[in-house]
From Swiss-Prot:
This is Cation/H(+) antiporter 18. The gene is CHX18. GO terms for cellular component: late endosome; membrane. It holds the Pfam family CHX17_C. The lineage of its organism: Eukaryota, Viridiplantae, Streptophyta, Embryophyta, Tracheophyta. Belongs to the monovalent cation:proton antiporter 2 (CPA2) transporter (TC 2.A.37) family. CHX (TC 2.A.37.4) subfamily. The chain crosses the membrane at residues 29-49, 59-76, 91-111, 126-146, 157-177, 193-213, 223-243, 277-297, 314-334, 343-363, 374-394, 406-426. Its main location: membrane. It is found in: Membrane. It comes from Arabidopsis thaliana. Gene3D superfamilies: 1.20.1530.20. It comes from the Eukaryota. It is a multi-pass membrane protein.
Length: 810
């Protein structure tokens, strides 16, 4: 008997091989085979994610499809492939790695749920969450009777009803966050409602899942299920008293900007594993313990964020895809055969959609949410994802769901998530509303009435450029005559594959910026918060913070839309290079350059690109300490007039001395510096108009400089464009800031355009930041809004490439 048993059971796999040269096949050993499986999974899911990117689908769709493709539904139909890559004897190792990844992923998911924020959830979000759970849960129980009578005969009735109810009522919180971010709804009112409701739904789903697991044990005695459930409750209560104080103590010893001690990280991961072991021993599931630890860890301070940074990439990128493969190996679409099976698939899918959408729609309309937004909320709340797969896999492992029911439920989850993005894009288009709101008067700094409020939208990627940017804004506020200055500080955050980059919206408030209004400002407060709050309080400038979370390929749309909605006169963008210690400029990120170019092409107002070379030093300068020398290099044309208008605004500040350099052609060289051909009467008329406007503003500058000591006017006659312009710059090389137009007009500017190495800065800006330039001052390059949507001299081919994406999106 022992011999027969030995023959029936394959020998366990050894960990490592001796190598092919000693006759070993690497895939007959556990470690090389696991490596091969991981590589195949990662490559396949990433390729699918890339292919689905134009459809703006979340990565979970690609991972689910990839898992199904590797299973018996497609590639797994080949016995040779299945035996070679996913042999049965390797599945224990594969599922162990997958569940370990799942354990830590659920810990991260718990970290992203702020219990204090849940307690502050408004009536609207709470009502939407409850309706989105109860109605689909009830309908799920109803449809489960049909399934049980047809394809799921003989299963535990109570457990089956609860599993089906949970599976149909779940909203995938992380997946919803990514969809909202992709659709640029993350920080809108509808986005905040959806996220708050989904967070409540998520917690309720875990409670129901724990109940379902307790009811689905192999022991038929209801007393055992009761003990499992009560033990789980006791674990949660005990952890609630023990875990928060310990981690609050750890968090107080971790400081912003300083590395977190390895001891704290290792101790936390050990606690996660221990709690996972305890809940597994109770009979719930190890992931439940990990999730509870994540929820209970206090979110204040840098410790929670540091944990995510340490764990997330390895778990989400390496281990978690294995869970989708383990799920895909159990999914056999071929089991769905015949009219009955496909009819049941339609029934389950319709029930899931109908319950979520109708429940959400009814409550939304009761709260007087507009119909279009209510329908959008319904489809958003219908998003499924990893949590759905977890429920289904637990049901499959516990023999509550058979192969056919499991396949039907997986396809239902895939379909409901897949349709969310296109339906929401069709139903709810906030861009339409932005276009209606798009008419406003002051789209440039240059204007007839200088007493009107100047609205600036300043953008930044990180904390490094904040001091100089604030010093620039301080210099721009003038003397607060008229309506003063209003600043919109837009934090540009890249929408990466990392869920933590998206789920920070837990902290978003009505101002739209997640890191702005943290409770209390202490030593650990973010330096960005401190800097802007200090500027707002000391300079009495109205600063309104916001955030934009988007991919670098279309974040320019967020910038332009925000400029329209906030009626900005000028958008100030950081240059894509930063200054090094030796004074040279190094590229921060190449895609920042393309963001700037796209904004130059599509901006609804004037645009400034700020080359930061340490304006005011490395710290914020208070109003009384401002002492800057600002130089405007004026050649002519609308961009130069816009730069001069900005300079005159700065000159109102008591700490600013403005020097205006006007470059004119020497009378002996008129027409000789460059040969200008006028192609038509329109260009000739425009040139005459620009020349007249230039002369008018120069006449005004002469008058101002004669009565105001803070404004100096210097006129330079040019004979050799390149040499004489460099010579003029040499005279004021010790200035703090240069203001220049991006595309200056006039004969001299045309002569130096050939030397423009950086089209977005124009010829003069490129000259000022070139290695040969004698000045190391900061530079603000300004393009005046012209109303045509054309940014000259960005290159025809480049312009076509930059705008093609936006045409496609329209």
């Amino acid at each position: 008997m022992a011999t027969n048993s030995t023959k029936a059971c394959p020998a366990p796999m050894k960990a490592t091989s001796n190598g092919v040269f000693q006759g070993d096949n690497p895939i007959d050993f556990a470690l090389p085979l696991a490596i091969l499986q991981i590589v195949i999974v990662i490559v396949l899911t990433r390729v699918l994610a890339y292919l689905l990117r134009p459809l703006r689908q979340p990565r979970v769709i690609a991972e689910v499809i990839g898992g199904i493709m590797l299973g018996p539904s497609l590639l797994g139909r080949s016995k040779a492939f299945l035996d070679a890559v996913f042999p049965k004897k390797s599945l224990t190792v594969l599922e162990t790695l997958a569940n370990l990844g799942l354990l830590f992923f659920l810990f991260l998911a718990g970290l992203e749920i702020d219990t204090k924020a849940l307690r502050r959830t408004g009536k609207k979000a709470l009502g939407i969450a409850l309706a989105g759970i109860t109605l689909p849960f009830a309908l799920g129980i109803g449809s489960s009777f049909v399934l049980k009578a047809t394809i799921s005969k003989g299963v535990n009735s109570t457990a089956f009803l609860v599993f089906m109810g949970v599976a149909l009522s779940i909203t995938a919180f992380p997946v919803l966050a990514r969809i909202l971010a992709e659709l640029k709804l993350l920080t809108t009112e509808i986005g905040r409602l959806a996220m708050s409701a989904a967070a409540v739904n998520d917690v309720a789903a875990w409670i129901l899942l724990a109940l379902a697991i307790a009811l689905s044990g192999s022991n038929t005695s209801p007393l055992v299920s009761l003990w499992v459930f009560l033990s789980g409750c006791a674990f949660v209560i005990g952890a609630s008293f023990i875990i928060p104080p310990i981690f609050r103590w750890i968090s107080r010893r971790c400081h912003e900007g300083e590395p977190i001690e390895e001891t704290y990280i290792c101790a936390t991961l050990a606690v996660v594993l221990v709690c996972g072991f305890i809940t597994d021993a109770i009979g719930i599931h190890s992931m439940f313990g990990a999730f509870v630890v994540g929820v209970l860890i206090p979110k204040e301070g840098p410790f929670a964020g540091a944990l995510v940074e340490k764990v997330e990439d390895l778990v989400s990128g390496l281990f978690l895809p294995l869970y989708f493969v383990a799920s895909g190996l159990k999914t056999n679409v071929a089991t769905i055969q015949g009219a009955q099976s496909w009819g049941l698939l339609v029934l389950v899918t319709a029930t899931a959609c109908f319950g979520k959408i109708l429940g959400t729609l009814g409550v939304s309309l009761a709260f007087k949410i507009p119909m279009r937004e209510a329908i959008t909320l319904g489809f958003l709340m219908n998003t499924k994802g990893l949590v759905e797969l977890i429920v289904l896999n637990i049901g499959k492992d516990r023999k509550v769901l058979n192969d056919q029911t499991f396949a039907i439920m997986v396809l239902m989850a895939l379909f409901t998530t897949f349709i969310t993005t296109p339906v929401v894009m069709a139903v709810y288009k906030p861009a339409r509303r932005a276009k209606k709101e798009g008419e406003y008067k002051h789209r440039a700094v240059e204007r007839e009435n200088t007493n009107t409020q100047l609205r600036i939208l300043t953008c930044f990627h990180g904390a490094g450029s904040i001091p100089s940017m604030i010093n620039l804004l301080e210099a721009s506020r003038g003397i607060e005559k008229g309506e003063g200055l209003c600043v919109y500080a837009l934090h540009l955050r890249e929408l990466s594959e990392r869920s933590s980059a998206i789920l920070m919206v837990h902290k978003v408030r009505k101002n739209g910026m997640p890191f702005w209004n943290r409770r209390g400002v202490n030593a650990d407060a973010d330096q960005v918060v401190v800097a802007f709050q200090a500027f707002q309080q000391l300079s009495r400038v109205n600063v309104r913070p916001m955030t934009a979370i988007s991919s670098m390929s279309d974040i320019h749309e967020d910038i332009c839309t925000t400029a329209v909605r906030k009626k900005a006169a000028i958008v100030i963008l950081p240059f894509h290079k930063h200054q090094q210690l030796d004074g040279s400029l190094e590229t921060t990120r190449g895609d920042y350059r393309w963001v700037n170019r796209r904004v130059l092409l599509q901006a609804p107002c004037s645009v400034g690109i700020f080359v930061d070379r340490g304006l005011g030093g490395s710290s914020q300068v208070s109003a009384q300490d401002v002492s800057y020398s600002v130089v405007v290099l004026f050649f002519g044309g609308p961009d130069d007039r816009e730069a001069l208008a900005y300079g005159l605004r700065m000159a109102e500040h008591p700490g600013i001395v403005l020097t205006v350099f006007r470059f004119v052609v020497s009378p002996e060289r008129v027409g000789e510096i460059v040969n200008v051909e006028v192609s038509n009467n329109n260009n000739e008329n425009q040139s005459v108009k620009n020349l007249k406007s230039d002369e008018e503003i120069m006449s005004e500058i002469r008058k101002i400089s004669s009565v105001d000591e803070s404004v100096k006017f210097v006129e330079k006659q040019i004979e050799n464009a390149a040499v004489d312009v460099r010579s003029a710059i040499e005279e004021v090389r010790r200035s703090n800031l240069f203001l220049v137009g991006r595309m200056p007009g006039g004969e001299i500017a045309l002569a130096i355009r050939e030397n423009s190495e950086c089209p977005e800065l124009g010829p003069v800006g490129s000259l000022l930041i070139s290695p040969e330039s004698s000045t190391k001052a900061s530079v603000l390059v300004i393009q005046q809004y012209n109303g045509t949507g054309i940014a000259p001299d960005l290159g025809a081919a480049e312009t076509e490439v930059l705008t093609s994406t936006d045409k496609d999106s329209d």
